[in-house]
């Protein structure tokens, strides 16, 4: 397999004859850091609660550990996550590498934080992460599904 295609964070699936890209969904740095701030807050609180529950007198170290863990992850994967792109065509939703979902196969579209989850009729789940406006992303996909784009 071509290693460049396998590790690509943009769609590598070829367009069908006559198929047109209607919109490209790119991640947003502000949404990325905002989501990680929320994750860090939860990790800090969880770390403190766990240490308190086991009777550790240094509960504050749970906050430090939670923050450090999320911060390391956030900085480590930021460059990859900011390159991920999804393309919406008049027929399909094309994701990083060779991910492709026919619009007619989409069963459910959900939102969580800044992400939009697309669930197919066969149960496959795809996540468009760190969207600047998750509701607009959802609306664009729904409009393309109904042919009203």
Describe each region flagged by the PLM.
Residues 55-57, 63-71, 115, 130-143:
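A general structural signal for short secondary-structure boundary/capping elements
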Residues 1-52:
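N-terminal membrane-targeting/pre-transmembrane regions
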Residues 67-108:
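Conserved beta-hairpin
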Residues 14-18, 81, 121:
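A generic structural signal for short, non-catalytic loop/turn and secondary-structure boundary residues
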Residues 2, 19-20, 26, 121-149:
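A membrane-cytosol interface segment of integral membrane proteins
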Residues 96-136:
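Acidic, Ser/Thr-rich low-complexity segments on the non-lumenal side of membrane proteins
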Residues 30-82:
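Alpha-helical transmembrane spans
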Residues 21-24, 87, 117:
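Soluble periplasmic/extracytoplasmic beta-strand elements of cell-envelope proteins
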